[in-house]
Amino acid sequence: MSRYGLQKLYINGAYTDSTSGDTFDAVNPANGECIAQLQAANAQDVDKAVAAAKQGQPVWAAMTAMERSRILRRAVDILRDRNDELAAIETADTGKPLSETRSVDIVTGADVLEYYAGLIPALEGQQIPLRGSAFVYTRREPLGVVAGIGAWNYPLQIALWKSAPALAAGNAMIFKPSEVTSLTALKLAGIYTEAGLPAGVFNVLTGSGDQVGQMLTEHPGIAKVSFTGGIASGKKVMANAAGSTLKDVTMELGGKSPLIIFADADLDKAADIAMMANFYSSGQVCTNGTRVFVPQALQAAFEQKIVERVKRIHIGDPSDERTNFGPLVSFQHRDSVMRYIDSGKREGATLLIGGYSLTEGALAHGAYVAPTVFTHCRDDMQIVREEIFGPVMSILSYQSEEEVIRRANDTEYGLAAGVVTQDLNRAHRVIHQLQAGICWINTWGESAPEMPVGGYKHSGVGRENGISTLEHYTQIKSIQVELGSFNSVF
């Protein structure tokens, strides 16, 4: 018997057997252990979930703003009470260190839910005077039933980032977590029901993106799809959503973000920022600053500071409190990252440290790749052009501000960017020229609930978090009122 046993779908306020009875395994990437069996949804299950959502959504939307706010706030309290329990599940499912999941993943997800719970009463329309006898008023109304499709790197946090604004606006959601890391989304569904969310308002369907995800994006009963994942999958989701019923979409896709260090920067601070921008969550963060641009004159000194810091990383069992760097999410992904590392070696980048998977000792049975740093990289190298989604830093040298801005923008991606400098005039001047939706000055990675996040170019469509996201989960109804007489031309 696996640690977490058989996991069912969540439809209409209850854990429910899938129609097909098919299952797939959840595997702990730290040791290869099967920790759960998950049921796979099929077309009949999708129809059931949509029907339940259509029934529950009007009940939810009819509640007062304060009633909805209180229910979501209760869910926040439950999440915080069960923080350690959920963190342990997340660590077993993703391989992320417990020190990370316990302090970040559940905490920040709950923060976003609390933020939107507080915004519900602020969802207001406008009153627009036309003339003495006439005016227009607007209402922000929910879209109805929306779908969320999550990625594997922040399973619970992403489920909350998508469900919080959707539910706050009065919608129902059908959420499909990544088939690689599905466990905590199923726990979240039960928490929502326990908090008082009406049956059918939040459903979870587990299974593959090619099957369950595609069925959701094409289903005529769904009004919007919010997707987090890679560019190729995002384009497919967007095409299916538009080709079926002109669904609205939000896309949070990949990145190959530049981190620019200027000559006046504190090099120790710059090295610390570069480490967090590359090796947090074992490098599996879409906003990571994996293209690190350093002035040519400072390159050697910067490299030395990076190598010193990489040597201090504690790679180990994710359940060990001392560990701050765990395995990659799966053995398949480990092999993908290693192919990129091999490509960097072949194309002539200089390997400073790392560059191998751990195949001996206590961690040999896990999907571990050592933190890896390449230098003397070129813009045309595969490791510089493509998103690796792993612990691989590429250091590139530059000589002028104009040059580094041009090179930083020379990518199909536009998710994030950052600068490290003591000159705030330069910081703002450069940031305003970088083609990226999320930018940091003298820091990296923090995404507060109040901060809209999303990408330029191929890195996304729409935004998550912040007040503006509520606009993406509502539609405006305009009503004109005439208080005086009406004159017909007929």
UniProtKB/Swiss-Prot annotation:
Pfam families: Aldedh. The modification Cysteine sulfenic acid (-SOH) is found at C286. K(+) 2 binds at L246, K457, G460. Keywords: Metal-binding, NAD, NADP, Oxidation, Oxidoreductase, Potassium. The keyword NADP applies. The record marks D248 as: Seems to be a necessary countercharge to the potassium cations. Pathway: Amine and polyamine biosynthesis; betaine biosynthesis via choline pathway; betaine from betaine aldehyde: step 1/1. Its cofactor is K(+). One of its GO terms (molecular function) is metal ion binding. K(+) 1 binds at D93, V180. GO terms for biological process: glycine betaine biosynthetic process from choline. It catalyses: betaine aldehyde + NAD(+) + H2O = glycine betaine + NADH + 2 H(+). Binds 2 potassium ions per subunit. Dimer of dimers. This is Betaine aldehyde dehydrogenase. It comes from Yersinia pestis.
